[in-house]
């Protein structure tokens, strides 16, 4: 079993190197400030955006919806695009788009798909999404 997992990991690494090289890029959402000898965050470089505002149906013990209060709200696709335009003008290189969970654990991102595509294509921002638990 362990040998099988190791082989799968080795194959995954090989595919990764073939497609992306050996460079690993890390993006750090900006909802909290931190500084190390290698990196310090800036509030505008990689902001976090919530498509549900402060709403979360689950209120899980690890967060209780508090993380949502650190995120910028964008409740419609148009709001999301306008917010990303503003963030780009302020120096953002990308953003994390997520939100509170629905009762099934999903984040309602479907209706934002076209706007997210526009943010990537027209604004050139790197976009990460967190789709739920």
Q: Locations of the language-model features?
A:
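Flexible, acidic/Gly-rich N-terminal and inter-domain linker regions that tether
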Residues: 1-54, 58
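Conserved Radical SAM active-site core
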Residues: 29-31, 37-40, 47, 52, ...
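The canonical Cys-X-X-Cys-His
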Residues: 60-63
